[in-house]
């Protein structure tokens, strides 16, 4: 036929049977990719340390989505929380992956069947015997079925009535588990961090979808609207479908990047804004002050800080630090986290506590500056030692660790103090294993960053596709140079007298 690459899909334009076939094949490929990717990730995933080596540090992409829907156990005998799996059953990680592979095979077979048996009576208008699809009715059917699915997910899966529930955690990502969630029908349901809103919105949207589907099945569109929106043209379906997809892609890009109940930090990693706002740092400080007010020593107060919480307060887990063109998991950058060294407290000779100014998100290097409680600079690591006034040596800075592996240890050696001051710029200080994965020391983005980047790119492409195909279908007659409706529509008794041929325009 000699079609250019961007017009090859015209071969299924007026062929409903093979249009179904190519969509079945596409769904087969998507399902097959999901199952295959899950098996690959399970093959390389290390479940041994859910605190310092969680799935998002290992670059897992499909496992977090399975986990947030309630899958937590593996046929390999492990669970996502680090415990031993007792009886994983069918709905384990491997079971879901296998189900996708089986579904892919069935869809593949269905695609071949529809490609071979493409000329079904179902696709022909009984009055004219021409290939024809009742697109408004098909729209109603799809809307009704998707509404049932949406309602079922919110009313049964999320609530735990018939299903496991979804992943629910606290704001600091410490206590996450799969739980049944009751729908929130008041104003709190609009809080993006309230999991009850997920259930309520799916129930409400499902009911709306069912009602809208029934409406479109029962009510025919007006002729002017049918013609104006080109409802008889399959390219109209393509254009509006692309609009739905690009809108969804933009929405999930936002919920992933800014955070929401649907994208818990235990599964996808923290957001960049939690570093920018000192979210975890403030919570750690609050807990420490509470412990100190109870009469505990500094070592005891810091020892009670969960290692998981301290690890979130580290800039290497900020998805905006990774860059868009550095391939690999976070562990391929700074390495596999082995342990928390403890909280570093810096003091000058007089005993006043100093605080290292933390590196902002979009800096690769940042001057090492230590300030007092009033924000006044008291010490630094100077660029030119000959002009320095506040160097570590001159001020006599020492560092003491509380909690962690170096609990109670003090260093006075300037070289060692400088080393830990540089590392304190990056938040809490951790020991990393860079040998196992030959990590290069350059930060990588978490799956949160990759997901956002990919979906923004696809949303922009699909937005252009919506405009392109929408314009093609609405202005089809203009582009083709042919008026699709050559005969004027006549409503006798209103615009035209019966038998008056002088004012009516007719095609030749």
Curated annotation (Swiss-Prot):
Domain of life from the UniProt record: Eukaryota
Protein's cellular compartments: Plastid, Chloroplast thylakoid membrane
MF terms (GO), sorted A to Z: chlorophyll binding; electron transporter, transferring electrons within the cyclic electron transport pathway of photosynthesis activity
Pfam families named among the record's database cross-references: PSII (PF00421)
GO annotations of cellular component type: chloroplast thylakoid membrane; photosystem II
Membrane-crossing segments per the record: 21-36, 101-115, 140-156, 203-218, 237-252, 457-472
Biological-process GO terms, alphabetical: photosynthetic electron transport in photosystem II
InterPro entries the UniProt entry points to: PS_antenna-like, PS_II_antenna-like_sf, PSII_PsbB
Protein topology in the membrane: Multi-pass membrane protein
Cofactor note: Binds multiple chlorophylls. PSII binds additional chlorophylls, carotenoids and specific lipids.
Keywords assigned by UniProt, alphabetized: Chlorophyll, Chloroplast, Chromophore, Membrane, Photosynthesis, Photosystem II, Plastid, Thylakoid, Transmembrane, Transmembrane helix
Protein's job: One of the components of the core complex of photosystem II (PSII). It binds chlorophyll and helps catalyze the primary light-induced photochemical processes of PSII. PSII is a light-driven water:plastoquinone oxidoreductase, using light energy to abstract electrons from H(2)O, generating O(2) and a proton gradient subsequently used for ATP formation.
Subunit structure: PSII is composed of 1 copy each of membrane proteins PsbA, PsbB, PsbC, PsbD, PsbE, PsbF, PsbH, PsbI, PsbJ, PsbK, PsbL, PsbM, PsbT, PsbX, PsbY, PsbZ, Psb30/Ycf12, at least 3 peripheral proteins of the oxygen-evolving complex and a large number of cofactors. It forms dimeric complexes.
Family: Belongs to the PsbB/PsbC family. PsbB subfamily.
Protein's UniProt name: Photosystem II CP47 reaction center protein
Taxonomic lineage of the native organism: Eukaryota, Viridiplantae, Chlorophyta, core chlorophytes, Trebouxiophyceae
């Amino acid at each position: 036929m000699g079609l250019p690459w961007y017009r090859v899909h015209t071969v299924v334009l007026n062929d409903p049977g093979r249009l179904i076939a190519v969509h079945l094949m596409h769904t087969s490929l998507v399902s097959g990719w999901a199952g295959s990717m899950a098996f690959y990730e399970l093959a390389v995933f290390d479940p041994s340390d859910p605190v310092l080596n969680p799935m998002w540090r290992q670059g897992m992409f499909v496992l977090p989505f399975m986990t947030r829907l309630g899958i937590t156990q593996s046929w390999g005998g492990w669970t996502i929380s680090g415990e031993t799996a007792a009886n994983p059953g069918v709905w384990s990680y491997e079971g879901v992956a296998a189900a996708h592979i089986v579904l892919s095979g069935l869809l593949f077979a269905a695609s071949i069947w529809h490609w071979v048996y493409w000329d079904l009576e179902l696709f022909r208008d009984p009055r004219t015997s021409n290939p024809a699809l009742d697109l408004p009715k098909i729209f109603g059917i799809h809307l009704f079925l998707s509404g049932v699915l949406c309602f079922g997910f919110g009313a049964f899966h999320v609530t735990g009535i018939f299903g496991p529930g979804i992943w629910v955690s606290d704001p600091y990502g410490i206590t996450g588990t799969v739980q049944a969630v009751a729908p929130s029908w008041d104003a709190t349901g609009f809080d993006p961090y309230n999991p009850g809103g997920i259930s309520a919105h799916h129930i409400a949207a499902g009911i709306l979808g069912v009602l809208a589907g029934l409406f479109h099945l029962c009510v025919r569109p007006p002729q002017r609207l049918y013609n104006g929106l080109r409802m008889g043209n399959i390219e109209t379906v393509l254009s509006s479908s692309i609009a739905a997809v690009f809108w969804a892609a933009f929405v999930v890009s936002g919920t992933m990047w800014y955070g929401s109940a649907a994208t818990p930090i235990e599964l996808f990693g923290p957001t960049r804004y939690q570093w920018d706002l000192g979210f975890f740092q403030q919570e750690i400080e609050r807990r420490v002050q509470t412990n100190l007010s109870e009469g505990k020593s500094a070592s005891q107060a810091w020892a009670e800080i969960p290692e998981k919480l301290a690890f979130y307060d580290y800039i290497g887990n900020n998805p905006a630090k990774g860059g868009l063109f550095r391939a690999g998991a976070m562990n391929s950058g700074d390495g596999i986290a082995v342990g928390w060294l403890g909280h570093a407290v810096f003091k000058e000779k007089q005993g006043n506590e100093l605080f290292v100014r933390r590196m902002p998100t979009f800096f690769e290097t940042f001057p090492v500056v230590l300030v007092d409680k009033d924000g006044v600079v008291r010490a630094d690591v100077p660029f030119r030692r000959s002009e320095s006034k506040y160097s570590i040596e001159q001020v006599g800075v020492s560092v003491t660790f509380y909690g962690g592996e170096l609990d109670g240890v003090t260093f006075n050696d300037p070289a060692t103090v400088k080393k830990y001051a540089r590392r304190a710029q990056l938040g809490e200080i951790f020991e990393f294993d860079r040998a196992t994965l030959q990590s290069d020391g350059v930060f990588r983005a978490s799956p949160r960053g990759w997901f956002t980047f990919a979906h923004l790119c696809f949303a922009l492409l699909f937005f252009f596709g919506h405009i392109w195909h929408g314009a093609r279908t609405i202005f089809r007659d203009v582009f083709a140079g042919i008026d699709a409706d050559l005969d004027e529509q006549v409503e006798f008794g209103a615009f035209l007298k019966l038998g008056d041929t002088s004012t009516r325009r007719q095609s030749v």
